Amino acid sequence: MMLFVDVGNTAMKWRYRDGDVIHQGGGRHEREWSRVVELMLRSLVGMPSEIWVASVAGPEADETIAYYLKEAIRCEPHFYYSCQSDFGVESCYPEPRKLGVDRWVAMIEGFQRYGASIIIDCGSALTIDAVDSRGTFLGGYIVPGLGMLRGALLRDTSDVHIEPGMAQLGLGRSTGECVHNGLLRMSVAFVTEVVLELRQVLDDTCKVLVTGGDAPELIGAFTFEFLHAPDLVLDGLERVAARQQ
C-alpha cells in the first residue's frame, strides 16, 4: 500500500492506493503534526509500505512528520521537492527549490494531462501559475486566500464581527455580508483578470485547473471555463511516485 501526503501551511491532506484501488483518505486543518500523523494513520485500512510527501510546511515540520511516521510504522517517507525540471516542466525560478512543491506538482500534473495550463490553487494563499505548451513555467502570483484576508480584516478592526456564511457577488446588507461578499468579489476579480490576460499569452483554449480547500467558495462565481481538480496536488505526487516503481 502507498500513502500520499500533501502538507500545506495550515493543513494536511492524504489518500492511499492499495493495488489498483485509490482510497480517499482525509484531511486535517491544524499544525500539531504529531497529532495529525496519528489521526491519518488511524484512518487507514492497513499500514503503508511506501509513503510520499509533498510539503511546504518547512524543514522543522518535515522532520517532525518523518520522525512520527518512522516511530509509528517504521517506514521512511520520501519527500519530493521542486527542482529545475521534471516531467517536461521547466522552472523559471533562479532557485527552483524555493518554489512551493504543491505548486510544482500541480503544474506537472496539469501539463502532463493537458499541456498548456493555468493552475489556480485556492488555499491559505491563493496562487495562480502558468505553464505554456512547451512546458515552460512562465511565472505566477501569490496573494492571501479568503481565510487569510478575513483574519487580517478582523484582527485590525475592533468593531467588525462576522458569522460564517455563504458569500455572493452582490452588495452586502449586514457587516458580515459586506465582508464575505467584498472579499469574494475582490478575489474573483483578481483571478478573472489574470486568467483573461494569460489566455492572450497562451492558447485561449488552454485548460484552467482549480484546486485547494477554498475552491468551492470561489468557483461558483467564476465566469470563465475551468475544471475543478480537488486532488491535483496528490495526483501530481502520485505521478512522481509511479516513476520510481
UniProtKB/Swiss-Prot annotation:
It is found in: Cytoplasm. InterPro entries: ATPase_NBD (IPR043129), Type_III_PanK (IPR004619). It is an enzyme of class 2 (transferase). Pathway: Cofactor biosynthesis; coenzyme A biosynthesis; CoA from (R)-pantothenate: step 1/5. GO terms for biological process: coenzyme A biosynthetic process. One of its GO terms (molecular function) is pantothenate kinase activity. The active site is at 102 (proton acceptor). ATP binds at residues 6-13, 124. K(+) binds at residue 121. Belongs to the type III pantothenate kinase family. This is Type III pantothenate kinase.
